Curated annotation (Swiss-Prot):
Its EC number is 6.1.1.19. This is Arginine--tRNA ligase. Monomer. InterPro entries: aa-tRNA-synth_I_CS (IPR001412), Arg-tRNA-ligase (IPR001278), Arg-tRNA-synth_N (IPR005148), Arg-tRNA-synth_N_sf (IPR036695), ArgRS_core (IPR035684), DALR_anticod-bd (IPR008909), Rossmann-like_a/b/a_fold (IPR014729), tRNAsynth_Ia_anticodon-bd (IPR009080). PANTHER family: ARGININE--TRNA LIGASE, CYTOPLASMIC, ARGINYL-TRNA SYNTHETASE. GO terms for cellular component: cytoplasm. Belongs to the class-I aminoacyl-tRNA synthetase family. It is an enzyme of class 6 (ligase).
Length: 588
C-alpha cells in the first residue's frame, strides 16, 4: 500500500466511525486500485460488506460514509457507483505535489521499513568439487534480488552461502586423487576445475562399484573429521580451488555472499542430537536416531521419520540444517530466515522446520520461510540440458548469452551505420547478456517452470531486460540531445500534468513504494519486473511522437515539467533494475 492509499484508508476508517459509531473502528474499508481509469484511481468496497450487519442497502451505507469523508486535499468529490462502490479520483494538484516531493528524494518516495530487523537469506549453495550449473542460476539471482530489496528497505541482511563442503564425497575424492593425481592434494591449483569435476565423477563410479575403495574412502572421512593434517590440507586446497571458480561466476553476476559452509556447523552436530534427546523427541529406529513427524507418511500410511543420526553414528543434511538453524537464531539473532531452493526440497524444509518447532527452538518473533522455485526447461519443454544430455554449466550459459548479445549489438550498429569502440561493444554485450539472463528468470512467477530461450530474452521488444535498458538509454539520449543535466533541473522544477499520457505515467511512478513493499512481504521479484515493464510502456506512450507529447520542443514551463517526468522515469528504472541486480547503460 502506497502513502496515498494509507492516507485514504485512514480517512475512510475515520468516516466509518463518524457514520456508524466506535464499534466500527478498525473495520477494513477494502480500498483497492480502480480496475478501470474511468472510475477514478481507487475504489472502496466496504459498503457492500457491511450491508447485512447494518441491515441497510449498500448505496445508503456508501452515502453515509461519503457524507463524513473529508478527502478534499487529495481527491475530487467522491462518487458512488453501481451497488455501492465509493470511487475516488486523485486531484491533479495532489498528483503534481507528490511528484515534486519524490523528485527531491533520492529514495523516490520509498520509505524504509517501520521495524527493520536482522534477516538471513540463504541462497546459491553450490557443492565443492562440482561446477555451478543451470540449477544454481535461479537460487543465486532470486536470492540476490530478495537480499537487495530487503537491504533497500533498511533491514540488516546476512547473505549466506551454505556450500556443500563436508561429508562422504571428500573421503571419496581424496582417496581417488591419492591414486591418480596426488599432487592435487598438496599443491594449490594443480588441477583445473574441469579435471576436478571429472575426477569426482570417476571417484563416484569407483565408490559405487568397489567395496574396498568404499571402506578406504570412509576411513578418509574419519581422518578428515579427526583433523589429520594431510587430509585437512587436501580438503582445504580442494575447497579453495572451487571457491575461486565460484567467485568468477559471482563477480560476473555481481552477487555478494558470505560463505558459511556445512563444515562450519560440524562441531555443533552432537549438541543438536543431545538437545533433541533431552527434549524427548528422539526415537531409535533400526539403529538410527530420528524424530517422527506429523503429517508425513509413507506409502503404507505409517509416520515418516526425519533421521538426525545414522546407525553408524554419522550425521546427514537434516542434522546440519538443524544446527545451522539454531546458530542463526541464537548467535546471528535473525528474526526472519529465508531459504531459496528448488521446489523439490519443500518437504525437507517442512520436516526440519517442524522438528525445530517441536524442540522449542523457534521463538514467536522468528519467521522461517522456504522460497521455492521451479525448473529451467529447454525449448523442448524438458529439463535444460546440453546436446549430449549433460547439465548445462552456468559459466557456459552466461558466456553464450554475452556472445549472442555481442552479435546483436554488431548487427544493430551496422544497420544504424554507427561506429563504436570495441570496448563499448564488449561492455554493452556483457551488461545486456547478463541482464537478459537475470531478467528472464526473475520476471517469471518463481514457483513456475520456465523455458530458457536466448532469442526471447535478448529481444528488444516485450517484457525483457533489453527493452527496459533501451527505455533507460532512450531517456539519457533526450538529456544528451537537449544538452540537459537532469540533476540541474533544480528544486524549482515543477510538474504540470495536462496530457492523458502524462497522467498515466505520473500515477504509475507513484506506485513504486507499494510494489517494493509487496515484494518485501511475499518475496516474489517478478512483481517488480511487471511494474518496471508497465512503467516502460507508459513512458514510451508518453514519448511516442504520434500519441504522446513534445518534450524538448515544448514551451516552458511544460518543457521542464516533461523533463522532470523523464528524469523520474529514468531514476525509477535505474533503482528498480538495481534491486533486480541489473546494471543500466547510458548508451546502447
Amino acid at each position: 500500500m502506497n502513502a496515498t492509499q494509507e492516507q485514504l484508508k485512514i480517512k475512510l476508517e475515520q468516516a466509518l466511525v463518524a457514520a456508524f459509531g466506535d464499534e466500527y473502528a478498525g473495520v477494513d474499508p477494502i480500498l483497492v486500485s480502480a480496475s478501470n481509469p474511468k472510475f477514478g484511481d481507487y475504489q472502496a468496497n466496504v459498503a457492500l460488506s457491511l450491508s447485512k450487519k447494518l441491515g441497510q442497502q449498500p448505496r445508503a451505507i456508501a452515502s453515509a460514509i461519503v457524507e463524513k469523508l473529508d478527502v478534499s486535499e487529495i481527491c475530487e468529490k467522491p462518487e458512488i457507483a453501481g451497488p455501492g462502490f465509493i470511487n475516488l479520483k486523485l486531484k491533479t494538484a495532489y498528483l503534481e505535489a507528490q511528484l515534486n516531493t519524490i523528485q527531491a528524494d533520492t529514495r523516490l518516495g520509498v520509505p524504509t521499513a517501520k521495524h527493520p530487523q536482522r534477516e538471513i537469506v540463504d541462497f546459491s549453495s553450490p557443492n565443492i568439487a562440482k561446477e555451478m550449473h543451470v540449477g544454481h542460476l535461479r537460487s543465486t539471482i532470486i536470492g540476490d534480488s530478495i537480499a537487495r530489496i530487503l537491504e533497500f528497505r533498511g533491514h540488516d541482511v546476512l547473505r549466506l552461502n551454505h556450500v556443500g563442503d563436508w561429508g562422504t564425497q571428500f573421503g571419496m575424492l581424496i582417496t581417488y586423487l591419492r591414486e591418480v593425481s596426488p599432487e592435487a592434494l598438496t599443491t594449490a591449483n594443480a588441477l583445473d576445475i574441469g579435471d576436478l569435476v571429472s575426477f569426482y565423477r570417476q571417484a563416484k563410479q569407483r565408490f559405487d562399484a568397489d567395496e574396498a575403495f568404499q571402506e578406504t574412502a570412509r576411513q578418509e572421512v574419519v581422518r578428515l573429521q579427526a583433523g589429520a593434517a594431510d587430509t585437512l590440507h587436501a580438503w582445504k586446497l580442494l575447497c579453495e580451488q572451487s571457491r575461486q571458480e565460484f567467485q568468477v561466476i559471482y563477480d560476473l553476476l555481481d552477487v555478494k555472499l558470505t560463505e558459511r559452509g556445512e563444515s562450519f556447523y560440524n562441531p555443533l552436530l552432537p549438541t543438536v542430537v543431545e538437545n533433541l534427546e533431552k527434549s524427548g523427541l528422539l526415537v531409535e529406529n533400526q539403529g538410527a536416531k530420528c524424530v517422527f513427524l506429523d503429517g508425513f507418511t509413507n506409502r503404507e500410511g505409517e509416520p515418516l521419520p526425519l533421521i538426525v543420526q545414522k546407525s553408524d553414528g554419522g550425521y546427514n543434511y537434516a542434522t546440519t540444517d538443524l544446527a545451522a538453524l539454531r546458530y542463526r537464531i541464537q548467535k546471528d539473532e535473525a528474526k526472519r530466515i529465508i531459504y531459496i531452493t528448488d521446489a523439490g526440497q519443500a518437504n525437507h524444509f517442512a520436516q526440519f522446520f517442524q522438528v525445530a518447532r517441536k524442540a522449542g527452538w523457534i521463538p514467536d518473533d522468528v519467521e522461517l520461510v522456504h522460497v521455492p522455485f521451479g525448473l529451467v526447461l529447454g525449448e523442448d519443454g524438458k529439463k535444460f540440458k546440453t546436446r549430449s544430455g549433460d547439465t548445462v554449466r552456468l559459466r557456459d550459459l552466461l558466456d553464450e548469452a554475452i556472445s549472442r548479445a555481442h552479435a546483436d549489438v554488431e548487427v544493430r550498429l551496422k544497420a544504424e551505420e554507427r561506429e563504436e569502440t570495441a570496448e563499448f561493444i564488449d561492455k554493452v554485450a556483457e551488461v545486456v547478456g547478463i541482464s537478459a539472463v537475470k531478467y528472464a528468470d526473475l520476471s517469471q512467477n518463481r514457483t513456475s517452470n520456465y523455458i530458457f530461450s536466448y532469442d526471447k530474452m535478448l529481444d528488444l521488444k516485450g517484457n525483457t531486460a533489453p527493452y527496459m535498458l533501451y527505455a533507460y538509454a532512450r531517456i539519457q539520449g533526450i538529456s544528451r540531445k537537449g544538452e540537459i543535466n537532469f540533476a540541474d533541473l533544480g528544486d524549482n522544477a515543477k510538474v504540470i500534468l495536462q496530457h492523458e499520457t502524462e497522467f498515466a505515467l505520473a500515477k504509475y511512478l507513484l506506485q513504486l513504494g507499494e510494489v517494493i513493499s509487496t515484494v518485501e512481504e511475499d518475496l516474489s521479484p517478478n512483481r517488480l519486473c511487471e511494474y518496471l515493464y508497465e512503467l516502460s510502456k507508459r513512458f514510451n506512450a508518453f514519448y511516442d511522437r504520434n500519441q504522446g507529447v513534445q518534450v524538448l520542443s515544448a514551451e516552458e514551463p511544460l518543457r521542464t515539467s516533461r523533463l522532470v517526468l523523464c528524469d523520474l522515469t529514468a531514476r525509477t528504472l535505474k533503482l528498480g533494475l538495481s534491486l533486480l541486480g541489473i546494471q543500466v547503460l547510458e548508451r546502447m
